[in-house]
From Swiss-Prot:
The keyword DNA-binding does not apply. Residues 68-84, 109-119 have a biased composition (Basic and acidic residues). The modification Phosphoserine is found at S91. It comes from the Eukaryota. This is UPF0547 protein C16orf87. The keyword Cell membrane does not apply. Residues 104-132 form a coiled coil. Pfam families: UPF0547. The lineage of its organism: Eukaryota, Metazoa, Chordata, Craniata, Vertebrata. Residues 43-119 are annotated as: Disordered. Keywords: Coiled coil, Phosphoprotein. Belongs to the UPF0547 family.
Length: 154
């Protein structure tokens, strides 16, 4: 029977001023009929009775923190710093931003890469002289001939 004995739980209690009975803190009234007044209601009643002064108004209102705004100082140093920051941001704008969220599909990424390659490809042989082009073509022909001969042996 000792194993099944319930564990004693201590509750937060308050005592009733009329009957000295222990009542749970969450209860607003005692079984004897006494009603506990909450601190919020007590403070509200006090503020209704006495008109609050300018100091009490600030205390009675809930304190709200406001965002502190810094004043901008007009100086050439600050302007130079702003210009530097802007120039950096412009240089970063060249990079393509990655899309946020879940990617649509893998094929869309491949299409983007192909587009980038097409845009980046520049004809490096456009400014090539005829003599250089002939030398390169002869070199390529020799390389191709060697590769073909290797395949025939295997």
């Amino acid at each position: 029977m000792s194993a099944t004995r319930a564990k004693k739980v201590k509750m937060a209690t308050k005592s009733c001023p009329e009957c000295d009975q222990q009542v749970p803190v969450a209860c607003k009234s005692c079984p004897c009929g006494y009603i506990f007044i909450s601190r919020k209601l007590l403070n509200a009643k006090h503020s209704e009775k006495s008109p609050p002064s300018t100091e009490n108004k600030h205390e009675a209102k809930r304190r709200r923190t406001e965002r502190v705004r810094r004043e901008k100082i007009n100086s050439t140093v600050n302007k130079d710093l702003e210009n530097r920051k802007r120039s950096r941001s412009n240089s970063h704008s060249d990079h393509i931003r990655r899309g946020r969220g879940r990617p649509k599909s893998a094929s869309a990424k491949k299409h983007e890469e192909e587009r980038e390659k097409q845009e980046k490809e520049i004809d490096i042989y456009a400014n090539l002289s005829d003599e250089k082009a002939f030398v390169f073509s002869v070199a390529l022909a020799e390389i191709n001939r060697k590769i073909i001969n290797q395949r025939l042996i295997l």
